């Protein structure tokens, strides 16, 4: 996914009210950008970090910029990280069209926002090609507290835990369901940040034990664009059967 116009560089002054960020541009102008990220953004929102903003083409929009990337000082060294949580679904759709997602090989269509479960909408429903329909939930990941290890979530994620339960319900009913974690940075492996949200950890492990598939992909991130790069290992283990005495 290439950005449609060149990004604007600045330095982060502060991120506040979850969805707002003040940025000092190179010429000294202070602008307020939309921050499309409801999470804690641990390690990504320090004052002075270099950031890149996409300019809005809508003259009626209140905020003229959206925060896209941050050059964060992460364990293992600095790197560009995508912080816009609206991007991962588009990245998955693009990778599907380009046949870059092996777990979805053979499917012909990928429909977005399909109703299922308890008044929920799954991110995608893959169908066609003589294959059973597959419910696909996408999660954005940009937390790194150990070199090479990407983690999710970076705050309590009750809605995401519910999504895992509903995917497990799809499998229990005889269907196919999967989680795709889009890591908007370089990483070597993925795991759940269970110390941040043990409830999501339990929900994912139960879903894996029920037969839900899970895949994690890193991204190539830079000023020109973001694209899904390669799969990495998921370290989270399925929940053990009840009464097994293991965790």
Curated annotation (Swiss-Prot):
Gene3D superfamilies assigned to the protein according to its UniProt record, in alphabetical order: 2.40.50.580, 3.40.1350.60
**Matching InterPro entries:** SfsA, SfsA_C, SfsA_N
Give the matching Pfam families. Answer: SfsA, SfsA_N
Extract the GO molecular function terms from the UniProt entry. DNA binding
Query: Which CDD domains does its entry note?
Result: SfsA-like_bacterial (cd22359)
Leader peptide range in chain numbering: none
Family, as annotated = Belongs to the SfsA family.
Please identify the protein, giving its name as recorded.
Sugar fermentation stimulation protein homolog
Naturally occurring in which organism (per UniProt): Methylorubrum populi (strain ATCC BAA-705 / NCIMB 13946 / BJ001)
